[in-house]
Amino acid sequence: NKKDNNGAIEYDKLLIATGSHPVSPPIDGMELSGIHSCWTLEDGRNIVKRAKPGANVVLMGAGFIGCIILEALALRKVNLTVIEMDDRMVPRMMDQNAGNLIKSWCMDKGVNVHTSTRVDGIEKADGGALKVRLNNGETLDADLVISATGVAANIQFLEGSGLETDFGVLVNDRLQSNIPDIYAAGDVC
C-alpha cells in the first residue's frame, strides 16, 4: 500500500463494506427519553435498564433484526407488544404463510403482535412512561419503545465518486460495482 502526496492509497482491488445505520421513522415523539434503537452497546445497556420483568415494551418493526430483539425481550419476561407496518412478520424474507406462522408462535408465547399497523405518535405520560398511539385507534402504555424500523446504507461519502448507487452500492452477482476492481459487500449494497 502506497500513499501519494494527496493521501490517496493505491490498491489492486477495493472492497467497500461500510455497513449501515438505523433509520428513525418520521413519527412525532421519537426524540423522547425511553425510545431507543438497538444498534450500539449504549443502546443495549439502556434497553436492559428498562426491560425489567413486567415492564411494558413496544417494539416497532418485526423484520429480521426486530425478531432477534423480540426473542431477547421475551426471555426477560417483559409485557411485549410488536408493531409491524407490513401484513406479516419478517416481510422481506418470509411469505404470508411463514410470516403468519411466526406471528402465531409469538402470540402463543404471550407476545402481542399487531401487523398492518403503524405507530402514529408517542407522548410522555405521567410518571415518565410513554403513550404509543397506533393508526387503529389503540393507545399502548410503554416503559420502553424500541425502534427496529430499518437501516440505510452508509454511502454518503461516495457522492461524486462515480460509483453507481441507489439505496446502496449497486453490484452484480459477483459483488462488483460499475468501476473495475471496486467491490461492495454487506449492508452497504
What are these regions (language model features)?
Residues 1-9, 123-139:
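Conserved beta-strand-loop-beta-strand element in the redox core of flavoprotein oxidoreductases
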Residues 8, 34, 79, 112-113, ...:
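Conserved beta-strand segments of alpha/beta enzyme cores
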Residues 12, 56-58, 79, 112, ...:
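Structural signature of beta-strand start/N-cap positions in the alpha/beta core
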Residues 13, 18-76, 171-173:
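Glycine-rich dinucleotide-binding loop and its adjacent helix/turn
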Residues 15, 36, 58, 81-83, ...:
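Hydrophobic/aromatic beta-strand patches that form the interior of the parallel beta-sheet core
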Residues 24-25, 67-68, 91, 142, ...:
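Glycine/Thr-rich phosphate-binding loops of Rossmann-like dinucleotide-binding domains
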Residues 31-53, 131-133, 138-189:
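FAD-site-proximal beta/loop scaffold in flavoenzymes
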Residues 45, 56, 64-123:
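Rossmann-like dinucleotide-binding cores of NAD(P)H-dependent redox enzymes
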